[in-house]
């Protein structure tokens, strides 16, 4: 009686382990990614379920009156300011080409998120564990 039970439990463990590895080798997006992270991690940073919206019930604004929202948050000064001229490059403006190159450098330096690593491409268990606050034993 114990041999069939141990055989069944061994087969179940092998199937569970192989399905987890198979999920980790493929791409993981949305709910699958959350499920696998909850299996791998004791704690991780879950996706916040609420959407960006108008201010909540604690504000005095009426969500059904869009003009009230615009009037409340519209800037007082609607004038267009002249861009700052550069002293080093008289023909160019600050905020032009030099700042756009800095923006490209900032974007390329940013660490890839879990979506870029595991949803757009396939990732392994080691990559998934990097996103855990506390790894499950």
UniProtKB/Swiss-Prot annotation:
Leftover remarks: Of the insulin-like peptides, Ilp2 is the closest homolog of human insulin.
Gene Ontology annotations of biological process type: carbohydrate homeostasis; cellular response to glucose stimulus; determination of adult lifespan; female mating behavior; germ-line stem-cell niche homeostasis; glucose homeostasis; insulin receptor signaling pathway; larval feeding behavior
Protein name: Insulin-like peptide 2
Organism annotation: Drosophila melanogaster
Role summary: Possible ligand of InR/insulin-like receptor.
Keyword Signal: yes
GO MF terms held by the record: growth factor activity; hormone activity; insulin receptor binding; receptor ligand activity
PROSITE patterns per the UniProt record, alphabetical: INSULIN (PS00262)
Tissue distribution: Broadly expressed at a low level in the embryonic mesoderm, beginning at stage 12. Expressed at a high level in the embryonic anterior midgut, with expression diminishing at late stage 16. Expressed at a low level in larval imaginal disks. Expressed at a high level in larval salivary glands and in seven cells of each larval brain hemisphere that may correspond to neurosecretory cells.
Endpoints of the signal sequence: 1-26
The organism's place on the tree of life at top rank: Eukaryota
GO cellular-component term (any): extracellular region
InterPro entries named in the record: Insulin-like, Insulin-like_sf, Insulin_CS, Insulin_family
Main localization (coarse): secreted
Keywords: Cleavage on pair of basic residues, Disulfide bond, Growth factor, Growth regulation, Secreted, Signal
């Amino acid at each position: 009686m114990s041999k069939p039970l141990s055989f069944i439990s061994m087969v179940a463990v092998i199937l569970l382990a192989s399905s987890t590895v198979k999920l980790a080798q493929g791409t993981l997006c949305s709910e699958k990614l959350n499920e696998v992270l909850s299996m791998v991690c004791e704690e991780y940073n879950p996706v916040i379920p609420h959407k960006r919206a108008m201010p909540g019930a604690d504000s005095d604004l009426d969500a059904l009156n869009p003009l009230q929202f615009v009037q409340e948050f519209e800037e007082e000064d609607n004038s267009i300011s002249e861009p700052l001229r550069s002293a080093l490059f008289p023909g160019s403006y600050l905020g032009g080409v030099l700042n756009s190159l800095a923006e490209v450098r900032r974007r390329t330096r940013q660490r890839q998120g879990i979506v870029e690593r595991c949803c757009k491409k396939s990732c392994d268990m080691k990559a998934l564990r990097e996103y855990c606050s506390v790894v499950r034993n």
